[in-house]
């Protein structure tokens, strides 16, 4: 994928293509070969890195970490057989709905 700007659906399609047609030595192939547990570990690591980066004023570092997390979540989605359209449908189903904020437990500041 060589576009200067990648869309999330295009990246998803690229990852899905790599799953179907592995390229030896590619990181995506490595993740699929290692399986779900490795992919989950990477999603967890990247989530933590996003949180840490968000606490700092360095926007480029935060952007990099969000991009890494997005990539790994898309790999997880492909591994699980979940499509971008399914996520978009779920998000659309929430549009205009009343918040259940009152039902959620209060988040205390640390």
From Swiss-Prot:
Pfam families: PRA-PH. Keywords: Amino-acid biosynthesis, ATP-binding, Cytoplasm, Histidine biosynthesis, Hydrolase, Nucleotide-binding. It is found in: Cytoplasm. Pathway: Amino-acid biosynthesis; L-histidine biosynthesis; L-histidine from 5-phospho-alpha-D-ribose 1-diphosphate: step 2/9. Gene3D superfamilies: MazG-like. One of its GO terms (molecular function) is ATP binding. It catalyses: 1-(5-phospho-beta-D-ribosyl)-ATP + H2O = 1-(5-phospho-beta-D-ribosyl)-5'-AMP + diphosphate + H(+). GO terms for cellular component: cytoplasm. Its EC number is 3.6.1.31. It comes from the Bacteria. One of its GO terms (biological process) is L-histidine biosynthetic process. InterPro entries: HisE, PRib-ATP_PPHydrolase-like. Belongs to the PRA-PH family. This is Phosphoribosyl-ATP pyrophosphatase.
């Amino acid at each position: 994928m060589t576009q200067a700007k990648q869309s999330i659906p295009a990246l998803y399609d690229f990852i899905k293509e790599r799953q179907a047609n592995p390229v030896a030595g590619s990181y995506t192939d490595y993740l699929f070969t290692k399986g779900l547990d490795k992919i989950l570990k990477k999603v967890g690591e990247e989530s933590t890195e996003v949180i840490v980066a968000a606490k700092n004023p360095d926007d480029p570092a935060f952007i990099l970490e969000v991009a890494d997390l997005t990539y790994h979540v898309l790999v997880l989605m492909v591994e699980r057989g979940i499509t971008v359209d399914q996520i978009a449908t779920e998000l659309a189903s929430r549009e205009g709905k009343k918040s259940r904020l009152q039902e959620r437990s209060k988040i205390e500041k640390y």
